């Protein structure tokens, strides 16, 4: 793009023999009324516009940073018109929501603490090469526009996608390259003062091809391999951050003097600590979540009342100080004594239980419980034509495996809104979905659309990883032949820096909800007994040393192995499919026979479905999936399809239960098989009229009536002459 005031910088991403990419940052021309705006290009033909705007005054009566990130997918970016009724974009797609989360997670902690002005980042996909993914480009675009907005922001942030292809980590892989990779991850980070890169966010998974590639000799994405991928991402992140810094230097902007609201002042903290510390130390040793929370609430209310006169109109500060004292107590006990809130050690897992087949009539169900976290998994199977059709900018057009996650308010003992899923629920469902996709059977091996629903009916730490475990159990209970069982665990981290600047780190296995809130890291790892299938990392620290992260991964592997043992005791192989589940069989026909099976205006396929009660789905390659409530209906439909696509000439003497399809003055045409009719002459109908001559066919037969007939003659042209098959003949046979 060219124009007055336009400035740009470029970052070169060099993957050696596997290709080079150019990320171009532009600013100064578009969206000039936003506080900060930038256009970011990937290889010249993918373009995203990001605009960051901040409210001029802080919001009243809130105790959080009101940051909103929106990703707008414009279908014109791919040269398409939206397929909706109104032919315009509506609510954001799931892919856009997930992209929002990818941006928000590293962006939010980079703002100064205590900011209360509303900040909105809007990223619009303007042009998209279908061979690339736009989500990581969006991270860089959002960072660039925010860097230029004059906000108290400690960026810039660089975001990259890394794929493991033939033992090499490739940055910004294409869609086709990702299909050949064994592991794929999005990594975001920023450059520290010493030049090192701090990893702030990771979203990663094995690919659908991983299982086959590993069996073929490729490197499995083990914990050690994943750790090398994070290190491989750092140089690319630095290149992207350097380009953003260079562009910001060309368009300097003073940081606005935004009011920053401290959670509390020192005098309030000292008073709260004096009054609450001893009793809080006792309360934070109560293992039961609800009992502990009730005790905390009672103590906080009492402290507020006692300090109300001393600190009038500073109730919010008292609450903030109370939380800070609680955090200090919990962290000190964990770091000094190695004892957690519920009495466990750093590596201990809460009590586990697993059970399958707990809900009647559904195709598969399971209950997985870890401490007070309780997840109900329910599996549903159906025809492939029920897979989700996607009209988005995603390279995927359909989704065969659909994973939905629900977390009702009662799961935490609270009231609240129920209904359409929030961004968090969509993100958790997607994480569990990605954890299971690598072990799902192929369409050819298991021709079903699969929907998995995870109901988080009790929550106290990592319901998303509990959903992975419950889903594995439910899918096996439904008869899905998984390649391996998958389990997940959430890891935490607490750290402390001494006077000499040395930092002590302690990784925690199976964190509670409180440990997540009071800790420094949320690290979710899912996988089989052999390799990692998905992971998600968010940290509040400037960075995590490689050895600490490697240790946490190893600790997660130990926990995952223990959980898999409990799950395997409940079910370790696919059950028989439920009687209520559809039976699907596969037929392969020549491609040139597809039209005959469908028939004019769908007449033939509709007739087969009406006659058998089966549901039929035809693929472009001639694969036909036949689904029915019982095996007999499916087999009947298969026989009728084979009769059309692979016809065999009927022989004299063969009997059929046929259907009258047409009556004439000289007889009735009877359908024996799809595409095979025979003539029952009027002279052969005496048995239908007590042995008397039939004057009109309509007197004894009507269209749609079923009759037992026998082939009496096949002429040279293949036309069939029929006679009635008598009950006596049937009895003789």
Curated annotation (Swiss-Prot):
Which cofactors, by name? Answer: Mg(2+)
Q: A Pfam family matched by this chain, by name?
A: RNase_PH
> What are its E.C. numbers?
2.7.7.8
Q: Which GO terms describe its cellular component?
A: cytosol
Localization recorded for this chain is:
Cytoplasm
Give the reaction(s) catalysed.
RNA(n+1) + phosphate = RNA(n) + a ribonucleoside 5'-diphosphate
Its keywords, alphabetically, are:
Cytoplasm, Magnesium, Metal-binding, Nucleotidyltransferase, RNA-binding, Transferase
Q: What class of enzyme is it?
A: transferase
Broad class of where this protein is predominantly found: cytoplasm
Could you mention a single GO BP entry for this protein? Answer: mRNA catabolic process
Annotated residues that bind Mg(2+) are located at 516, 522
GO molecular function, one example?
RNA binding
S1 motif domain: residues covered: 653-725
Return the Gene3D superfamilies for the record: GHMP Kinase, N-terminal domain (3.30.230.70), K Homology domain, type 1 (3.30.1370.10), Nucleic acid-binding proteins (2.40.50.140)
Cross-referenced PROSITE patterns = KH_TYPE_1, S1
The ranges of region (Disordered) come to 404-424
KH domain location: 582-641
Q: Which InterPro entries match?
A: ExoRNase_PH_dom1, ExoRNase_PH_dom2_sf, GPSI/PNP, KH_dom, KH_dom_type_1, KH_dom_type_1_sf, NA-bd_OB-fold, PNPase
Please give the family membership noted in the entry.
Belongs to the polyribonucleotide nucleotidyltransferase family.
Q: What does this protein do?
A: Involved in mRNA degradation. Catalyzes the phosphorolysis of single-stranded polyribonucleotides processively in the 3'- to 5'-direction.
The protein's name in its UniProt record: Polyribonucleotide nucleotidyltransferase
Q: State the species of origin.
A: Cutibacterium acnes (strain DSM 16379 / KPA171202) (Propionibacterium acnes)
Lineage of this protein's species? Bacteria, Bacillati, Actinomycetota, Actinomycetes, Propionibacteriales
The encoding gene = pnp
């Amino acid at each position: 793009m060219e124009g007055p005031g336009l400035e740009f910088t470029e970052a070169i991403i060099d993957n050696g023999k596997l290709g080079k990419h150019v990320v171009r940052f532009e600013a100064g021309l578009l969206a000039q009324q936003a506080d900060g705006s930038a256009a970011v290009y990937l290889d010249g033909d993918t373009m995203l516009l990001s605009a960051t705007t901040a409210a001029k005054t802080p919001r009243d009566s809130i105790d959080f940073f009101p940051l909103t990130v929106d990703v707008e997918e414009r279908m014109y970016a791919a040269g398409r018109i939206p397929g909706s009724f109104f032919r315009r974009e509506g609510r954001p797609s799931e892919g856009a929501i997930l992209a929002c989360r990818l941006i928000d997670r590293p962006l939010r902690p980079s703002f100064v603490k205590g900011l209360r002005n509303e900040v909105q980042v809007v990223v619009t996909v303007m042009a998209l090469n279908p061979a690339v993914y736009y989500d990581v480009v969006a991270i860089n675009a959002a960072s660039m526009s925010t860097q230029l907005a004059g906000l108290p922001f400690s960026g810039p942030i660089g975001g990259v996608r890394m794929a493991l292809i033939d033992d090499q980590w490739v940055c910004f892989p294409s869609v086709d390259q990702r299909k050949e990779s064994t592991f794929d991850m999005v990594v975001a980070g920023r450059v520290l003062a010493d030049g090192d890169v701090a990893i702030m966010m990771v979203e990663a998974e094995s690919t659908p091809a991983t299982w086959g590639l590993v069996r073929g000799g490729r490197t499995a994405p083990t914990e050690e391999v994943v750790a090398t991928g994070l290190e491989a991402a750092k140089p690319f992140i630095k290149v992207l951050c350097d380009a953003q810094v260079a562009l910001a230097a060309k368009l300097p902007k003073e940081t606005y003097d935004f009011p920053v609201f401290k959670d509390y002042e020192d005098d309030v903290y000292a008073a709260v600590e004096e009054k609450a510390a001893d009793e809080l130390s006792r309360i934070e040793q109560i293992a039961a979540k609800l009992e502990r929370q009730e005790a905390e609430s009672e103590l906080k209310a009492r402290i507020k009342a006692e300090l109300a006169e001393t600190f009038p109109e500073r109730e919010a500060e008292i609450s903030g100080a109370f939380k800070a004292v609680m955090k200090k107590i919990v962290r000190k006990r964990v770091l000094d004594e190695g004892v957690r809130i519920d009495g466990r050690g750093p590596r201990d897992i809460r009590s586990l239980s697993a059970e399958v087949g707990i809900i009647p009539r559904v195709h598969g169900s399971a209950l997985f419980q870890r401490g007070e976290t309780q997840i109900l998994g329910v599996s549903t199977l159906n025809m492939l034509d029920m897979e989700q059709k996607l009209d988005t900018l995603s390279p995927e057009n359909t989704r065969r495996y659909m994973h939905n996650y629900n977390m009702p308010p009662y799961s935490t003992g609270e009231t609240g809104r129920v209904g359409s899923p929030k961004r968090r629920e969509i993100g958790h469902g997607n994480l569990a979905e990605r954890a299971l996709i690598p072990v799902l059977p192929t369409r050819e091996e298991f021709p079903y659309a699969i929907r998995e629903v995870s109901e988080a009916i009790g929550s106290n730490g990592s319901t998303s990883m509990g959903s992975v475990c419950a889903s594995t159990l439910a899918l096996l209970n439904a008869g899905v032949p998984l390649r391996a069982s998958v389990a997940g665990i959430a890891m935490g981290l607490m750290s402390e820096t001494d006077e000499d600047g040395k930092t002590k780190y302690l990784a925690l296995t199976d964190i509670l909800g409180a440990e997540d809130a009071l800790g420094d890291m949320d690290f979710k790892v899912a996988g089989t007994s052999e390799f990692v299938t998905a992971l998600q990392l968010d940290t509040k620290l400037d960075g995590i040393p490689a050895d600490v992260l490697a240790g946490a991964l190893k600790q997660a592997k130990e926990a995952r192995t223990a959980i898999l043992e409990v799950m395997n005791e409940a079910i370790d192989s696919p059950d028989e499919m439920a009687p209520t589940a559809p039976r699907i069989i596969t037929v392969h026909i020549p491609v040139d026979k597809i039209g005959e099976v469908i028939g004019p205006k769908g007449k033939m396929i509709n007739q087969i479905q009406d006659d058998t009660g089966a549901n039929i789905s035809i693929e472009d390659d001639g694969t036909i999936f036949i689904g029915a409530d019982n095996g007999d209906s499916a087999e009947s439909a298969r026989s009728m399809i084979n009769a059309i696509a692979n016809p065999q000439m009927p022989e004299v003497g063969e009997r059929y239960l046929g259907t009258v399809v047409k009556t004439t003055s000289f007889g009735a045409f009877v359908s024996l098989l799809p595409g095979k009719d025979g003539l029952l002459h009027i002279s052969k109908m005496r048995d239908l009229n007590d042995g008397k001559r039939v004057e009109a066919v309509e007197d004894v037969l009507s269209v749609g009536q079923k009759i037992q007939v026998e082939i009496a003659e096949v002429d040279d042209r293949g036309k069939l002459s029929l006679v009635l098959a008598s009950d006596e003949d049937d009895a003789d046979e």
